[in-house]
Structures are given as C-alpha cells and as structure tokens.
Amino acid sequence: MRDIKFRVWDKNNRKMILDENILKICFLGKGHTPNMIVYSDKKISEYEEIDKRYCHNFELMMYTGVNDCKNKEIYEGDIFVHNNQKFEVIYDGTRFIGVDSDRSGNGYCCYVDSCYKDGSSSIEVTGNVYENTESLKEGNK
C-alpha cells in the first residue's frame, strides 16, 4: 500500500506547500473538490502554537507512490524525463500516467509505476508545471 500524501500549489502566492506543512484539506459543501487548505509555513510541532494560513485558490496534487532515480517523490504535475522524452504526470482516474509534454494528441504516454527496471526507477523528475513552466516549453530532446 502506498503512502497518501499531497502537496499544494498556492496560485495567489505562487508557492508550493509541501505535505508536511498541510494541516487540513477542507471539503465544504457538496462535491469531491476541496475548497480550502489550512497550512503552516513552519515545520509543525505539537508543542508550539501554529501560525495557520488559509489558501482558497490552489491546485491539489497527489503523491504517486513512486520515487524517481534520485529517490525524489513523484507527484501529479511533475515533469520527468524517461528515455530522453519529457512527460507531465497526470491522474487519469485509475492510474498515474506521464503524458508527452507537447500534448499534440499524437504523443506518447507511459504509466509512472511501470518505469522500473530491476527494481529501480528509470525516470528523473526535472521540475513541475507550476514552478518550471519553461521546462515544458523547451520540448523533448
């Protein structure tokens, strides 16, 4: 069973909020889409008063359960390289897949959890679509 982790892109402040800083994901009202994130800028300790921050304009990204060749956790929205090709990680409703960054419709995709050889990952995360938009624009090698 994989770890359930999230990270959040705060659109207003243009910064990534990591899993260890997320205090609460709020689902207010009907539906399956969260509409508020409560987080702290500091590492959370049970002995200190927490300076809570609220985020309403965000993108929530789930951890795939897979790490890259440098043991970096892979999340939705990450950009990775596999066989000299760039991919963006998306969730298709059943599995995490890497979609060819050109999104031409004629592109290639791969299952993130299938990019392993002899128990080690053959992919490397090079950034994400929020903080490294230029990486996608560069295209494939």
Could you describe each region identified by the protein language model?
Residues 1-141:
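Secondary-structure transition motif
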